[in-house]
Amino acid sequence: TQIFDLAFISASCAIVVECGKLIAAGKSFDEIVEILPSIQSRIKVYYVLETLTYLIKGGRIGKVAGIVGELLKLKPIISINDEGTYYTYSKVRGRNKSIAKLAEIAHDALMKAKSKIWVLHGGALEDGKALYDTISKLPNISEINFGDISPVLGVHTGPGLLGIVIMKDN
């Protein structure tokens, strides 16, 4: 038995799929355990919320900061560092700009390396489909997928989450 901290909720399925591919390729348990950190290091996660309300209610951000953010229509683009800590990667004003920023982040990553992309949503199907359509036209995509976020993440963010998971190819 081996325990491996993925450090993020939303991209865990990507790692499970990669492990499945390694098993199919005949890799042993020990070889897969050895490879896991390199898989994790190739994954970046970015997401944006439609509202800050649920972060305020959950105590993830202060009430004053959240209310000011809502009034200014600030949309933080949230990412996760290598230690699993969530941080504000960027801030934009308005939903449309936040969706465009996610597409820009995907574009910039794909210009650096061929990658697999997952477009994820939590109660934002139409926005998610639009983001998927935009990103799917970008070069250097080895694989693109679309789906729902983990309910564990949705509990903290509420409806309206959009996210992208970028995994650089080997």
Specify the residue positions occupied by each region the protein language model found.
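Mixed-charge interfacial surface used for oligomerization/domain docking
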Residues: T1, A7-N170
